[in-house]
Amino acid sequence: MNLRSLLASTPTQVLQPQHAALDLAITGLQTDSRRCQPGDLFLGMPGTQVDGGQFWPEAIAAGAVAVIVTPTALAQRPLSANPEACLILSDQMPVTAGAIAAAFYNQPAQTLKLIGVTGTNGKTTTTHLVEHFLNAADTKTALLGTLYNRWPGYSEVAQHTTPFATDLQAQLATAVDAGCQAAVMEVSSHALDQGRVNGCGFDVAVFTNLTQDHLDYHGTMEAYFAAKARLFAPPYLRGKAVINADDAYGQRLITMTPPGQCLTYSVVGTADFCTTDLQYGPTGVEGTIKTPDGAFPFRSPLVGQFNLANLLGAIAAGWTLGLPIETMLAVVPDFVGVPGRMERVVGQDSDPTVIVDYAHTPDSLENLLKAARPFIQGELICVFGCGGDRDRTKRPLMGEIAARLADRVIITSDNPRTEDPRQILADIVAGIPAASPVVVEADRAAAIRQAILSAQPGDGVLLAGKGHEDYQILGTTKIHFDDREQARLALAERQSA
């Protein structure tokens, strides 16, 4: 594909050389100058700390035949750095990158049934449920999200909840080549704010909820909501919106969505998809689901009201795509869950119940504790921490929630990154009443061991915050660490004592 066709309808300005250079053949796209090869087009993406476009001379030196950068990047590294380079300017790099990537990979999103799920919590479980329903209906489906990018015959660990525009379009194109007919993906607020899903039109967009998180990036809840809301308007929304009516921000979003383009779901009220006659238990929930096609009995192995909301959102999305309600409900009992989401680490009958979960926001931690409480006969022990270099304002809130809903709390490290772990722990403790039974143990392995060894039969130990993660970030170093492995070690020590 030549450069001229890639630039069609993009907000770009060719600075040098003359237009004859636009007939150059482009054989690859890169956003990292260090990965450029001969024939590549380098897209200099602005970041939160560094504008990647400033490395355009390095991209040319590595073999890139043309570069597109922002005015800011050009000011940092002017044309004199390489007078012969084919240099193109864009003041809307996310729009430009998305359009170019989609064109280069032959518009894969237009070939697929595309489902996007956004929200603070519930994205991963909801996308897995939609994937489960589509595969059960013999619709070969790609899944892109926090854990991995996968489809039948292929799987890789995800680097981001939502890939960058060039990587995303490449993934979708590969999925199309593999015979996929649909793709369901988690769409993060960062991705929407940074234009990573530009070039994608979604047949279904699902909104799960919005609670405090990522304020280190967005600054305010209003800005956070505005980023999420972009998914529910053109050019992203080309089909139906599916919105959680139990969420206050969901209610706002409903009023912003064009009439006839929105379906709602609710666990506690009336909506297009809602529930009655619910019976919660330690092995899940059963009851009746009301839909536009009538009422149906159902049974789900997923524990907790929040997981019922995820199920309703997924069923509404599947129905929008034409899946019969009966087909979806028939396979709900077979859903095995998601790694690191209410995942039980199995021990012996004399051991406490140990649950690992990704809950790392105030709302998700509260939901986790409330969901676990009815099924724990003894004390509920919560082990958690908060990530460093991230939203600091949620730390005391999570401390208060844990102290209020758990019988015992052990505060520990999560991914401290470049922050002082002692300061993170102090921020959490600041939200906890002085009389609460709280232990502070910065070493996460020691905290998990202490919780499990001190627990009595019938107690529950919740290890919150890291879920599926098999690493811990200390400073700028990533080391191997898995809550589930640490729990198994502690259970084995307990059993051998």
From Swiss-Prot:
Q: Where in the cell is it found?
A: Cytoplasm
Pfam families xrefs: Mur_ligase, Mur_ligase_C, Mur_ligase_M
Could you say which residues bind meso-2,6-diaminopimelate here? R390, D414, N415, P416, R417, G465, E469
Q: Which cofactor does it need?
A: Mg(2+)
Residues binding UDP-N-acetyl-alpha-D-muramoyl-L-alanyl-D-glutamate = S33, T161, T162, S188, Q194, R196
GO MF terms, alphabetically ordered? ATP binding; magnesium ion binding; UDP-N-acetylmuramoylalanyl-D-glutamate-2,6-diaminopimelate ligase activity
Q: In which pathway does it act?
A: Cell wall biogenesis; peptidoglycan biosynthesis
Principal localisation = cytoplasm
Catalysed reaction(s)?
UDP-N-acetyl-alpha-D-muramoyl-L-alanyl-D-glutamate + meso-2,6-diaminopimelate + ATP = UDP-N-acetyl-alpha-D-muramoyl-L-alanyl-gamma-D-glutamyl-meso-2,6-diaminopimelate + ADP + phosphate + H(+)
> One Gene Ontology cellular component annotation?
cytoplasm
| Alphabetical UniProt keywords | ATP-binding, Cell cycle, Cell division, Cell shape, Cell wall biogenesis/degradation, Cytoplasm, Ligase, Magnesium, Nucleotide-binding, Peptidoglycan synthesis
Record-listed N6-carboxylysine modification sites:
K228
**BP GO terms, sorted:** cell division; cell wall organization; peptidoglycan biosynthetic process; regulation of cell shape
Q: How is it modified after translation?
A: Carboxylation is probably crucial for Mg(2+) binding and, consequently, for the gamma-phosphate positioning of ATP.
Q: Where is this motif: Meso-diaminopimelate recognition motif?
A: 414-417
EC top class, in one word?
ligase
**Which HAMAP family does the entry mention?**
MurE
Summary of the function given for this chain in its UniProt record: Catalyzes the addition of meso-diaminopimelic acid to the nucleotide precursor UDP-N-acetylmuramoyl-L-alanyl-D-glutamate (UMAG) in the biosynthesis of bacterial cell-wall peptidoglycan.
Q: Which family does it belong to?
A: Belongs to the MurCDEF family. MurE subfamily.
Q: Which NCBIfam families match?
A: murE, PRK00139.1-2, PRK00139.1-4
- Name this protein carries in UniProt: UDP-N-acetylmuramoyl-L-alanyl-D-glutamate--2,6-diaminopimelate ligase
Q: Which gene encodes it?
A: murE
